[in-house]
């Protein structure tokens, strides 16, 4: 398998995270720019298991093993949500989101309001964070600072 395909990351996660291998934690979506950054949305089939915590591991040991394999690529593990507003907000991490407005549910268009200090973080270097969040969620995301609506 090519190291550049999203399935490569999922394969690494299955090797390092027993909860993914045994189906307790499920990878719901993945968006990747190989060598730069990957975003993975996870959910748990067991309310007792935190899906993000299971992926990161105690002291970050599980995520560290994956990061070692992908050599410098960043990996964001976030909670998947059936609610598109929550999922979009989660996908824009590490930025803080104030509000997500669905502008057109049918065409999957949303506006995200962030504090002005979070705008560059939400968009990311070269638009990378916004691009990966849009790919991950399947929504067109328009990010605005809270004062410019």
Question: Where does each model-flagged region fall?
Answer:
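RNA-contacting regions in translation and RNA-metabolism proteins
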Residues: 1-149
